[in-house]
Amino acid sequence: KYYYPVEYMAALITSVIDNAGKTSEYILVTRNMGIQILPPDINEGNVGFSVSGDAIRYALTAIKNVGRPVIEGIVAERKEHGPFTNLKDFVIRTAERDVNKRAVENFIKAGAFDSLGGNRRQYISIYSQVIDGIQKDRKNNMAGQISLFDIADEEDKKDYELKAEIAF
């Protein structure tokens, strides 16, 4: 506690992560000690509160209505394939890890996507459409549905585009 206060407080807060009252209390104590609490970040956060330099990174599992298995899946995906670049990249890469609309909405509201650029209002207005579009694409791919353009070769596509231009 004396020699490693940041590490100690991160471990202490993580130990009571299921108790919102205790978590809030220890976060307040941590701030009073002069230790900065960094906001949740989809590319930096972990299952528990973690040390980031001289500060503590807010745990992704402390975000309300997002389960531990979902967070573990997100962290595993990030470790396997690198940081997420944007909201669409996040949704595509975590679709098979039980990340649903509600979880994405809660991440947005908590500020976990703030480091990706854009703002929360923008993300809130588009996240549902992004998820629906990706789910629709996956459903079509799983059903084996392909468009005629998927099987056409490059010459056929150019032929069609030329005929379409002439028709106008």
What residue spans do the PLM features occupy?
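Noncatalytic, beta-rich nucleic-acid-contacting surfaces in large DNA/RNA-processing enzymes
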Residues: K1-F168
